[in-house]
Amino acid sequence: MSVFYFTIFYKLHKILETLTGGIILYKLIKYIKMKRENILTGSPWEDKMGYCRAVRIGNIIEVSGTVAIVDGDKVKADDAHAQTLNILERVEKVLEDLNASMKDVIRTRIFTTDVSTFEAVATAHATFFKDIKPTTGFYGINQLVAPEYLVEIELTAVLAE
């Protein structure tokens, strides 16, 4: 961090310290020290596109849009339920690699090319989240990266501090 930015942070801290009793400096130092951890899965698209499966910074985890794949092969092009289960199984593994679990998920975003699959997708989603109940969005979209994909899921997890 440059001296310029540190000076600004320090001056801001002094002003806020007066108002908050010193809590701001602790939080600012904690924020500055947070490291970024990327999870790569070996997909050729990670380098081609410049992304990773998940990123953890501090206690926040963001998981990229995930589609149904088993050993590099697409899963059941006509079965949104099976695709959703596969996606959530893959995401669960990614969370475990980051010392997290599905219980830490606070939000899922489900994208589908066919909103008539809502019940099938919802049933599969409930298999993992019935007792956790993260906030969830279900979005009908025009298409995903391949016509076989019916479902793509992104999620956010937050670990307790």
Feature locations, PLM:
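Short, polar/acidic, helix-capping and beta-turn segments at strand->helix junctions
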Residues: 34-161
